[in-house]
Swiss-Prot record:
<dbReference type="InterPro" id="IPR018116">
    <property type="entry name" value="Somatotropin_CS"/>
</dbReference>
<feature type="modified residue" description="Phosphoserine">
    <location>
        <position position="176"/>
    </location>
</feature>
<feature type="glycosylation site" description="N-linked (GlcNAc...) asparagine">
    <location>
        <position position="166"/>
    </location>
</feature>
<comment type="function">
    <text>Plays an important role in growth control. Its major role in stimulating body growth is to stimulate the liver and other tissues to secrete IGF1. It stimulates both the differentiation and proliferation of myoblasts. It also stimulates amino acid uptake and protein synthesis in muscle and other tissues.</text>
</comment>
<keyword id="KW-0964">Secreted</keyword>
<dbReference type="Pfam" id="PF00103">
    <property type="entry name" value="Hormone_1"/>
</dbReference>
<dbReference type="GO" id="GO:0008083">
    <property type="term" value="F:growth factor activity"/>
</dbReference>
<dbReference type="GO" id="GO:0046427">
    <property type="term" value="P:positive regulation of receptor signaling pathway via JAK-STAT"/>
</dbReference>
<comment type="similarity">
    <text>Belongs to the somatotropin/prolactin family.</text>
</comment>
<dbReference type="GO" id="GO:0005179">
    <property type="term" value="F:hormone activity"/>
</dbReference>
<comment type="subunit">
    <text>Monomer, dimer, trimer, tetramer and pentamer, disulfide-linked or non-covalently associated, in homomeric and heteromeric combinations. Can also form a complex either with GHBP or with the alpha2-macroglobulin complex.</text>
</comment>
<keyword id="KW-0325">Glycoprotein</keyword>
<dbReference type="GO" id="GO:0031667">
    <property type="term" value="P:response to nutrient levels"/>
</dbReference>
<keyword id="KW-0372">Hormone</keyword>
<keyword id="KW-0732">Signal</keyword>
<feature type="disulfide bond">
    <location>
        <begin position="208"/>
        <end position="215"/>
    </location>
</feature>
<protein>
    <recommendedName>
        <fullName>Growth hormone variant</fullName>
    </recommendedName>
</protein>
């Protein structure tokens, strides 16, 4: 084959490959509504697991006097995640932008990746369906990825790593005034339920603002 013909053939093949790449990048992305549906499904699942496990643990092990004393003492009821600035009421929540609410939700999820593994024995003994430390951790990681994807889509689509919650729960635990293992687990479950409720609420608000017809569901 002549050199000129070979060059022309290679050029044509290169242009064909380029057109394939361009077509591949033009594939439609996952609809925003589906991304929100997936994130909300995981958030609801996490909250339900947190709520059911908390209720089960409280009924089985915590006396009413202990519960009252725990909740009334700001030192024992202090949640590790309270170091994350979150809106304290509905009005302040509504004043936050979509990205702010997603960032807060992301940090709350990341804050539980370490301490949820300390509840291994609690989840192992729980009768709540799906309540194992591996399942809960996987749900947290899945939701972390889902929220990061939503943040990427709601911004300009440029790659980003997102904020990372890198404080250590173990440092907080060493300063804890609660040395009783039973009450320590109770406190973790109390805070886990509280934070998963926040995440679900924040995601629901952002979904309502971003996806037409999604409010109220």
């Amino acid at each position: 084959m002549a050199a000129g013909s070979r060059t022309s053939l290679l050029l044509a093949f290169g242009l064909l490959c380029l057109s394939w790449l361009q077509e591949g990048s033009a594939f439609p992305t996952i609809p925003l509504s589906r991304l929100f549906d997936n994130a909300m499904l995981r958030a609801r699942r996490l909250y339900q697991l947190a709520y059911d496990t908390y209720q089960e643990f409280e009924e089985a092990y915590i006396l009413k006097e202990q519960k009252y004393s725990f909740l009334q003492n700001p030192q024992t009821s202090l949640c590790f995640s309270e170091s994350i600035p979150t809106p304290s009421n509905r009005v302040k929540t509504q004043q936050k932008s979509n990205l702010e609410l997603l960032r807060i939700s992301l940090l709350l999820i990341q804050s539980w990746l370490e301490p949820v593994q300390l509840l291994r024995s609690v989840f192992a003994n729980s009768l709540v369906y799906g309540a194992s430390d591996s399942n809960v951790y996987r749900h947290l990681k899945d939701l972390e990825e889902g929220i990061q994807t939503l943040m990427w889509r709601l911004e300009d689509g440029s790659p980003r790593t997102g904020q990372i919650f890198n404080q250590s729960y173990s440092k907080f635990d060493t300063k804890s005034h609660n040395d009783d293992a039973l009450l320590k687990n109770y406190g973790l479950l109390y805070c886990f339920r509280k934070d998963m409720d926040k995440v679900e609420t924040f995601l629901r608000i952002v979904q309502c603002r971003s996806v037409e017809g999604s409010c109220g569901f």
